[in-house]
């Protein structure tokens, strides 16, 4: 049940500060258009059409990484999505930014510079600390209201996400509203029939958290091929990381007792891959039965065809299906079989379905599916996991105060 104010509670024509999550892939310095712009455009366009003066906050990448770039390209992409001019200023709360904010007229949209270029944005600290930063105090006085639409970043206690609701009127944008409602449904909704969850990705802690918290709700957990630590607990020596970083070894060492205990307690609810795919000496996709893996010597990058044949009817016969993360390295078409196949099976059903994780919407777009074939497609990653496990989302909590 939502307990925060939404755009329906906001009087038209005010000057508003809107936090979006436009964090995007960057290839050779070029920001890639993606579904996040589609989603957030709904909020921004509604506000502009209602005569609000709109200033946008967003982040991109992390300091020191190749994707840590300015938001000037984001402003251009957003303009295409809302079909109106969007201005950009290369400051977040400096004198030029304040000047441009003061010059906003009804229906104008201004994108401020990358929040993570501000010293006050990082690291994560209590909301009360972030509310007292120069960043928050400077901008708060320039606006009538703050709107958080960045559900996918709601697990982060950063200044632009948690500071403003403590010092000014705060509202949820349309993405925040719909994502929160859909992603909490699994914990609140009751089902009479089979409930299935497809769990992918490479983070053992995410797999553990999801399965531990949802074991009474979910009848069958189907595991993706690169969640390699769980097959290891079942006695199959799978998995080097694709960059030879021994990701599985490190995660196994840190979480082996929890994984073994989880597998022992919930073995009848867990369906493991029966075959896995790897790159052979000719750079082609090859598959191997899990039972035939007797030593750890390969990087397995996807579930195999037999696994997909086993998983698909389980999905299609379910009353509800939830998906989290990838089944394989779908960016490489050779290893897209698992991720694309699972998503196609979910799309083919009429059941209640929610799919999410940081890469899911990208996979849907890459392989020609439409979001309306699913009950809900979450653009969130970490926040989606936390919602499924009923963990605190600090960005939502401050809106509810």
UniProtKB/Swiss-Prot annotation:
Query: Which residues does the annotation say bind ATP?
Result: 331, 357-360
- Which UniProt key words apply to this protein? ATP-binding, Cytoplasm, Glycolysis, Kinase, Nucleotide-binding, Transferase
Kindly list the GO CC terms recorded for this protein: cytosol
Q: Which InterPro entries match?
A: Phosphoglycerate_kinase, Phosphoglycerate_kinase_CS, Phosphoglycerate_kinase_N, Phosphoglycerate_kinase_sf
Q: What are the disulphide bonds in this sequence?
A: none
Primary residence:
cytoplasm
The entry marks the following residues as binding substrate, namely: 21-23, 36, 59-62, 116, 156
A Pfam family reported for this protein in Swiss-Prot or TrEMBL: PGK
Q: Provide the catalytic activity annotation.
A: (2R)-3-phosphoglycerate + ATP = (2R)-3-phospho-glyceroyl phosphate + ADP
Could you say which EC number(s) this protein's record lists? 2.7.2.3
Q: In which pathway does it act?
A: Carbohydrate degradation; glycolysis; pyruvate from D-glyceraldehyde 3-phosphate: step 2/5
Q: Which GO terms describe its molecular function?
A: ADP binding; ATP binding; phosphoglycerate kinase activity
Protein's name according to its UniProt entry: Phosphoglycerate kinase
Organism encoding this protein: Haloarcula vallismortis
Top-down, what is the taxonomic lineage of the species of origin?
A: Archaea, Methanobacteriati, Methanobacteriota, Stenosarchaea group, Halobacteria
The gene is pgk
């Amino acid at each position: 049940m939502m307990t925060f104010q939404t755009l329906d509670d906001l009087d038209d024509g005010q000057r508003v500060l809107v936090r979006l999550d436009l964090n995007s892939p960057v290839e050779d310095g070029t920001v890639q258009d993606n579904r996040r712009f589609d989603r957030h455009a709904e909020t921004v366009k509604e506000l502009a059409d209602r005569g609000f003066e709109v200033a946008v906050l967003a982040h991109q990448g992390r300091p020191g990484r190749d994707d840590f770039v300015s938001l000037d390209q984001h402003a251009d992409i957003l303009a295409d999505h809302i079909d109106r001019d969007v201005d950009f200023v290369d400051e977040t709360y400096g004198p030029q930014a304040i000047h441009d904010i003061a010059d906003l007229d009804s229906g104008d949209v201004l994108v401020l510079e990358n929040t993570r270029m501000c010293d006050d944005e990082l690291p994560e600290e209590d909301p009360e600390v972030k509310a007292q930063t120069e960043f928050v105090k400077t901008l708060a006085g320039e606006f009538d209201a703050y709107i958080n639409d960045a559900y996918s970043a709601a697990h982060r206690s950063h200044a632009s996400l948690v500071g403003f609701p403590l010092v000014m009127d705060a509202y949820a944008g349309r993405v925040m509203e719909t994502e929160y409602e859909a992603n909490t449904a699994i914990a609140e909704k009751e089902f009479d029939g089979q409930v299935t969850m497809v769990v992918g990705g490479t983070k053992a802690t995410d797999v553990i958290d999801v399965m531990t918290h949802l074991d009474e709700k979910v009848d069958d957990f189907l595991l993706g091929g690169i969640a390699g630590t769980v097959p290891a607990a079942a006695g199959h020596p799978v998995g080097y990381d694709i960059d030879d970083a021994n990701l599985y070894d490190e995660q196994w060492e840190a979480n082996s007792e929890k994984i073994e205990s989880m597998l022992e307690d919930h073995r009848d609810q867990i369906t493991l891959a029966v075959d896995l795919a790897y790159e052979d000496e000719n750079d082609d996709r090859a598959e191997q039965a899990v039972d035939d893996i007797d030593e750890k010597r390969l990087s397995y990058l996807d579930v195999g065809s037999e696994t997909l044949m086993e998983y698909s009817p389980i999905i299609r016969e379910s009353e509800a299906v939830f998906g989290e993360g990838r089944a394989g390295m779908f960016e490489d078409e050779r290893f897209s079989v698992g991720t694309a196949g699972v998503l196609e099976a979910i799309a083919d059903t009429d059941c209640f379905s929610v799919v999410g994780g940081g890469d899911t919407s990208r996979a849907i777009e890459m392989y020609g599916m439409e979001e309306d074939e699913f009950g809900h497609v979450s653009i969130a990653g970490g926040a989606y996991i936390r919602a499924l496990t009923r963990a605190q989302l600090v960005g939502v909590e401050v809106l509810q105060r």
